[in-house]
Amino acid sequence: STSAGYIDTRGVTEQHQFNAKVAYSFDHGGLGFTKVGVSGQRGQLLNQGTGETDWHAAYAAHLQGRYGGFEAKLEFAQQELNPPSVTDDRFVVMGAYGSPNRVASEHNVYSSSLAYHIPVNAGPISEIKPYYDFSQVTKDVDTWNDNVNHDIGFLTSAGPLFVYTDLIISKGHPFNQPFDGTFSGVMAEQNDNEWRTAFNVNIGFY
């Protein structure tokens, strides 16, 4: 593996990566703030078998706002990866949680989030935050279906304990997908464009 990111199971790895980010925050006094920014990434991809290299890059623009109890986030990101000396350069292989997944080499990501912070004084519970998160991944290959995710839920904060309870409605979500032969390819060519629903509880202790 590499400290920069991922290693492709076909022997393609990242190297010589550069990241930059610029952001500015507008203070609205007692109302809150709005932060806008842009970021970029540029680096090389190395085929460890052949020694050949090519480039990869990603660019993003984001907005974050806090207005009283309301919190809003918007982001657009674009990524292009050019794996050298591979039979099919339309995808790269990335690993997450011990599973290799094919991901479209060229794709756009659209994401948004809306939440509301509710102070609570009920035993150890200090805050409840209902939220709605949306994301969509569009791919450069016209015949590959988009990945779409709706996440509706709430976060309960109690001291060092954080509990996310949500309903996930998605098309092509890698972890809301049957664990069959299509699981590893939903971020590339094997998204069947079917809506699936899952109930999720995530507990964190910090």
Regions from the language model: what does each represent?
Residues 20, 114, 191-206:
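Outer-membrane beta-barrel "beta-signal"
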Residues 27-34, 69, 118-128, 159, ...:
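Short loop/turn motifs that connect adjacent beta-strands in outer-membrane beta-barrel proteins
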Residues 32-38, 61, 70-74, 112, ...:
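Transmembrane beta-strands of outer-membrane beta-barrel proteins
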Residues 14-18, 55-59, 66, 106-110, ...:
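Residues that define the transmembrane beta-barrel architecture of outer-membrane proteins
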Residues 28-30, 42-50, 71, 80-86, ...:
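Gram-negative outer-membrane beta-barrel proteins
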Residues 1, 36-42, 65, 74-78, ...:
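Transmembrane beta-barrel strands of outer-membrane/channel proteins
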Residues 1-48:
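Aromatic- and glycine-enriched pocket-lining scaffold segments that form the walls
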Residues 1-13, 48-50, 82-103, 174-191:
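Solvent-exposed loop segments that connect transmembrane elements
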